[in-house]
C-alpha cells in the first residue's frame, strides 16, 4: 500500500486551544507558501488498517506528531516495523506476531483501540487495554464492543483488558445507536476481511471515514456507500 494522507478540512485544520482573544492587524498584503500537514485523525485509523494486510505499507503526508509516534509504538509492540522519514511513514506489518496492546501505551491515546478490530480479523484474537484502564460503568468503547460482538466476537473484560480468543468474524447487519467516528472505523476495518457481507447503518460520514474507506478499497477491500449513512462491506 502506498497512499497519501489528505489535509484536514478547514474547520478541523487546527485544534482548539484556550485563549482570551486573537487580534489580527490587517491591511497588509499576504504572500508566500505554507505547508499543511496531513490530518492526524485520518492517519491513525489508516495506520491501524495496515495490520489487516501483511506487507510493507507506505503512508505519505503523515504528520509527525506525538500521537502518530505513540501509535507507531503500539504497532511495534505487536511486531510491526515502523519508520518515519519526513512525512513518509513506512509500516511493515508482515512480522506481526503479538495480539497484546499494553496499558502503558493505550492509556496515553484512546485511538490505540483501533488495533482491536484488525487484530481480531487477522489474528483471531486480541488483548487490548481499555483506554481508561479497569473502569466501572459505561465506557467510551462500548459501541465498538457491541458491534464486534454482532460480528461474532466473544469478548471479555479481564483486569482492564479487552480479550478475545478463537474469534471468527462474520458479516452482519448492525445499526449504530449513536453516530461514532471511532466505532465506524473499527467495524469497517474488522468487516474488510471478515467472512460474508456486513451492512452498517447510521455510520459516521466525516472525512476520516471516507479516507479510511478509500485506502481500504485501494488495498483490495470492497466497501460501498462512502459519503452515506450506510456502508456495505463485502469481506475479502
Q: Which residues does each predicted region cover?
A:
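Structural preference for solvent-exposed beta-strand-turn elements
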Residues: 1-236
Amino acid at each position: 500500500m502506498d497512499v497519501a494522507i489528505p489535509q484536514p478540512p478547514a474547520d478541523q485544520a487546527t485544534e482548539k486551544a484556550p485563549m482570551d482573544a486573537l487580534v489580527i492587524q490587517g491591511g497588509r498584503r499576504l504572500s508566500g507558501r505554507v505547508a499543511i500537514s496531513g490530518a492526524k485523525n485520518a492517519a491513525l485509523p489508516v495506520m491501524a488498517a495496515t495490520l489487516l494486510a501483511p506487507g510493507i505499507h507506505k503512508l505519505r503526508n503523515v504528520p509527525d506528531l506525538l500521537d502518530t509516534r505513540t501509535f507507531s509504538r503500539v504497532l511495534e509492540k505487536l511486531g510491526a516495523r515502523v519508520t518515519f522519514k519526513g512525512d513518509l511513514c513506512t509500516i511493515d506489518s508482515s512480522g506481526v506476531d503479538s495480539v497484546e496492546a499494553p496499558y502503558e501505551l493505550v492509556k496515553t491515546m484512546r485511538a490505540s483501540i483501533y488495533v482491536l478490530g484488525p487484530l481480531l480479523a487477522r489474528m483471531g484474537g486480541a488483548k487490548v487495554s481499555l483506554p481508561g484502564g479497569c473502569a466501572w460503568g459505561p465506557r467510551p468503547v462500548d459501541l465498538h464492543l457491541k458491534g464486534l460482538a454482532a460480528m461474532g466476537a466473544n469478548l471479555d473484560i479481564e483486569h482492564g483488558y479487552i480479550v478475545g480468543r478463537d474469534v471468527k468474524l462474520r458479516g452482519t447487519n448492525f445499526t449504530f445507536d449513536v453516530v461514532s467516528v471511532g466505532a465506524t472505523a473499527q467495524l469497517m476495518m474488522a468487516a474488510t476481511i471478515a467472512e460474508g457481507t456486513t451492512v452498517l447503518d447510521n455510520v459516521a460520514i466525516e472525512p476520516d471515514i471516507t479516507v479510511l474507506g478509500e485506502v481500504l478499497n485501494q488495498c483490495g477491500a470492497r466497501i460501498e456507500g462512502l459519503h452515506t449513512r450506510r456502508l456495505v462491506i463485502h469481506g475479502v
